[in-house]
Amino acid sequence: MAILSDKDIKKYLDEGRIVIDPITNEKQIQPSSVDLRLGDQFKGFKIITKPYIDPFDNTDLESYMSSITVEEDKPFIIHPGEFTLATTYENVKLPDDIVARVEGRSSMGRLGITMHVTAGYIDPGFEGNITLEISNIGKMPVALYPGQRVCQIVFETMTSPSEKPYGHEDRDSKYMGQTGPQVSKIKEDFDIINGGK
């Protein structure tokens, strides 16, 4: 596997093999990545009386979350210790022979802001907005603005195309085509559906 350079990223974008829509400024394309911007939708956990989240109970996980849409030029403030789901402004589409990783920009990390907890890997064939799992591990509240560059996507070629890429009918492609921050769909995992077997 090899990481795509800016030259190759531009070529793949021009050919339509990789889609990032929209790229409004050529400066988003970095030496080996593309900067992605923050969307305007956020989801955070409500304070509830339930002692814990259990993937085996019947509660809809969406009921644990509150949603907010931030107006243009207004900030979303994330406080120390808080966690929120957000989304990229851009829609991303990958071919069957490219994987991607989303990494936080170092400028955000130096403020104590992480862009993903564990879901930084994007399978070949994925299409949609990318859900970000944003945490503030710093000691100060931080303002985040829709349209702000907050993360970068890195592309890697595979040794061969996937036989069953993300979105294939035989795949567990729960987040295919997502258009905003999506809550966990862990209850749709085959091992949860089968009672942990």
From Swiss-Prot:
It comes from Methanosphaera stadtmanae (strain ATCC 43021 / DSM 3091 / JCM 11832 / MCB-3). Homotrimer. Pathway: Pyrimidine metabolism; dUMP biosynthesis; dUMP from dCTP: step 1/1. It is an enzyme of class 3 (hydrolase). The keyword Hydrolase applies. This is dCTP deaminase, dUMP-forming. Keywords: Hydrolase, Nucleotide metabolism, Nucleotide-binding. It comes from the Archaea. InterPro entries: dCTP_deaminase, dUTPase-like_sf, dUTPase_trimeric.
